[in-house]
């Protein structure tokens, strides 16, 4: 439990329904999702309520980001149609207590970017490094894009075996 120091969550304009939900016969709304890709399906995302892979405040940051975006009419990514403001969110946690959040946007909407990042910074003082990336490409890779440090430090510090490591937004 809580063994990951980096998780990448994906935004999707329609959440993936489980087999049980489909077989229930219930009519489900096309609710957006912020979670993990279904294996071998680039456009299917399982909405995550509670993730046991990473310690808090990761869950709270993810769920508050989802809530804020839905409440404020932010569009979630549609991979097939290549549209939507919200694409990905990466959360890094360190044993030192430092937290890095990187939000990847599909459009360069500075007003909405600032509103979300200001909201996260105000509500999560645990975030010591807050970045954003604008990715208008058709793929989700961001290695060739420049992360913008919006607030805080340009790295977090991880400590292992008495050694301290600087971890940046593009580290492993």
Task: Describe the role of every protein-language-model region.
Residues 1-172:
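Accessory RNA-recognition modules of RNA-modification enzymes
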């Amino acid at each position: 439990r809580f063994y990951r120091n980096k998780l990448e969550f994906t935004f999707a304009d329609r959440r993936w329904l489980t087999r049980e939900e489909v077989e229930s016969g219930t009519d489900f709304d096309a609710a957006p999702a912020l979670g993990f890709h279904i294996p071998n399906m680039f456009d299917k995302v399982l909405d995550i309520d509670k993730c046991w892979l990473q310690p808090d405040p990761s869950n709270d940051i993810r769920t508050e980001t989802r809530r804020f975006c839905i409440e404020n009419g932010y569009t979630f990514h549609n991979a097939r149609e290549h549209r939507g403001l919200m694409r990905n969110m990466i959360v890094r946690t360190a044993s030192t207590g430092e937290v890095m959040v990187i939000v990847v946007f599909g459009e360069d909407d500075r007003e909405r970017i600032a509103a979300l990042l200001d909201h996260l910074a105000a509500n999560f003082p645990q975030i010591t490094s807050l970045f954003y990336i604008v990715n208008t490409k058709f793929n989700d890779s961001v290695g060739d894009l420049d992360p913008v440090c919006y607030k805080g430090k340009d790295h977090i510090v991880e400590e292992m075996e008495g050694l301290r490591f600087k971890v940046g937004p593009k580290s492993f």
